[in-house]
């Protein structure tokens, strides 16, 4: 999997400031236990480079990147230490061009049309938007996405658990960055359980799992319609005819054939089907690619290969 694809699948990129190299591996481990397997260790402290080296060596499952990289020399040092992606607060043409030429994933900070055009000219279309709260946040990125539709942003600064879902729901947001889930204070005080908890919370918000509907298998269209009409009479759920199934409101789908699942299926809504597929794969639950459905080129629904209590389960984009 490509580095940027992995960042997008996680959805949240912790911005980590390490003062003591000995804290790098415990911090990385806490994030991993919380379900976040990417981290951006900044070069804001003298320990930054060695922290990258320690985390990359000590936690091979963690995708470690370098942040606050402002020069090409720093970029090369970070890569030598084990960084797998480079994040810069601004746009340095020399550094970005070198990264592109050498196949290094880089997300430079770009907040103006001029900077975005300069990055796009080099083939870079995933950009850091920093500080997001100072430069207009979602409204600014939405405006910029008009003329630059091929660009997606990683807003950092002013993003936390309270507004994470709102940011990730925007189609022009690739992922978000932030220090709230791996705070400098928590690292310094050894509160790695708190870091794990915040990482898990952020991951849950990014995925947004919730029950969508329950699907029942029936042998034919006539039987399907009879059941949705029964739900209508009992609960007032509106009858919604469809090509392969009928719905009773939005809660019950009744198939017109004996479809997947011994008893039927359960739909789980999510904020991002691709993120959910990646998340579940890491937990041993595979997706059935033959059932994938796309909308506007994006994966919108897919079944899992495993059944749950006789029910097939499929993911549905909110």
Task: Report each predicted region and the residues it spans.
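N-terminal beta-strand motif that seeds the catalytic metal site of vicinal oxygen chelate
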Residues: 3-17, 203-228, 261-268
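Glycine-rich, proline-tolerant flexible connector loops at the mouths of alpha/beta enzymes
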Residues: 32, 36-59, 180, 185-187
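Vicinal oxygen chelate
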Residues: 251-256, 281-318
